[in-house]
Regions:
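A conserved beta-strand-to-alpha-helix junction within the catalytic ATP-binding
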Residues: 44-62
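Short helix-loop "hinge" at the ATP-lid/N-box region of the Bergerat-fold HATPase_c
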Residues: 99-100
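Short beta-strand/loop element within the Bergerat-fold HATPase_c
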Residues: 107-117
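Short conserved segment of the HATPase_c
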Residues: 130-142
């Protein structure tokens, strides 16, 4: 059917499809968040190697980064941690998605190291950066940084990431310089 449409109609159909996918993603995120907050979903942390999880996330975002002219690097690690694979993937994917979305040129690095009683996963970018005054607010539900409001999004990705990671006994920190980029450090119990 679509092949019989005039070019302008096909463009409209494509635009409608893209918007419906964004709406579906938003609804899906809100449902996940609600279920997590209301205890309907429980996390099941297991002691697991991080490399396969990080490799999957890097592969998921590699094409999107390349389309934007970005380099995405995953540094090999032999670190293990205690986490729920499905939900930690969701949390880290939200952070990597933001890194790709808010980086216009440069690189995104994903690495993991041992840090005291935690495995620390660093996701660093050369993107827009976040002002010091906003760094404490970015994990608030629906908060959007002033310098990225023209980008698509509703401000629940980092909130959801923090909820997941804290539910696993971990935490997230951010270090950022406006115009230089950000490093999100995710700490998971070993």
């Amino acid at each position: 059917m679509e092949e019989n449409l005039p070019a302008s109609a096909k463009a409209n159909v494509d635009a409608l499809y893209n918007q419906s996918e964004k709406l579906r993603f938003l609804i899906d995120s809100l449902v996940k968040l609600s279920r997590l907050e209301n205890g309907i979903i429980s996390l099941s942390p297991q002691h697991t190697a991080l490399q396969p999880l990080l490799q999957g996330i890097a592969e998921q975002y590699s094409a999107k980064a390349t389309e934007k002219g970005l380099s995405l690097y995953l540094h090999d690690t032999d670190i293990s941690a205690t986490f729920d694979s499905k939900w930690t993937t969701e949390a880290l994917a939200n952070i990597v998605d933001n890194a790709v979305k808010y980086t216009e040129h440069g690189t995104i690095n994903i690495s993991a190291v041992s840090y005291e009683m935690f495995a620390r996963i660093d996701i660093s970018d050369t993107g827009a950066g976040i002002s010091e005054s906003e760094q404490s607010k970015i994990f608030t539900r629906f908060y959007r940084s002033k310098n990225v409001r023209e980008q698509e999004g509703v401000g629940i990705g980092l909130y959801l990431a923090r909820q997941i990671i804290s539910g696993e006994g971990g935490y997230i920190k951010v270090a950022s310089v406006p115009g230089k980029g950000s490093t999100f450090s995710v700490f998971l119990p070993k």
